[in-house]
Amino acid sequence: MTIKSTLIFLSLMSYSWLQAQNPTIIYIGDPMCSWCYGFAPEITKVKEALPDHEFKVVLGGLRPQGTETMADLGDFLEHHWKEIEKRTGLPINYGSIGDDSFILDTEPGCRAIVVAREMKPEIELDFFKAVQRAFYIDNKDMRSEKTFIEIADKFGLDTSAYAQKFNSEEARYNTRSDFHLAAEMGIKGFPSVIVRHNSQLYLAANGFRDAEDLLKIISD
């Protein structure tokens, strides 16, 4: 299924990595998106199975600048989390459910990944998964730079440089650019996967898919 139009194509060509010679897997998600957490092992398998493909993460922005608390969204999230546990077998820590001081703003987590990608592009998916773990397993404060600096340190990044970049207007702008790119691609839900091949963009997944199914779609 192609999602390309001339207008979108011309706009997207400003992103140099979309002009790569090799086919490209584009994963669009948000580290605090429930089904993106469930999808993490599947997209990892896809990446590992297609070493001849370029791989890029685009941050979609689930609830940037969100103001609702985990108490506000607790029942809704708990329902989805139980579905994800049943479908994937992944563990989830429910400790944050019902916390009226925990604000569900996904922009800082997305920005944390954008900065890590700038400093060390090859870790972007692993860093994405580490941010997911901070939320879904460790119940870390996802608006605190300390959370992301700790992750950066584990990846061997210069934490002083990371903190400076994380708090910069450039990082905020680059994060918004990812959100805008996802919108330009026509993405309205996460996780989504787009394949770029021969200058065409094809929607391979809009929502959770097993890696086996996704690989079949990509190979067709």
Where are the regions that the model predicts?
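Generic anion/oxyanion-binding catalytic loop in active/binding sites
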Residues: F9, N22, G98-S101, I137, ...
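Secondary-structure boundary motif
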Residues: L12, W17, E48-D52, E118, ...
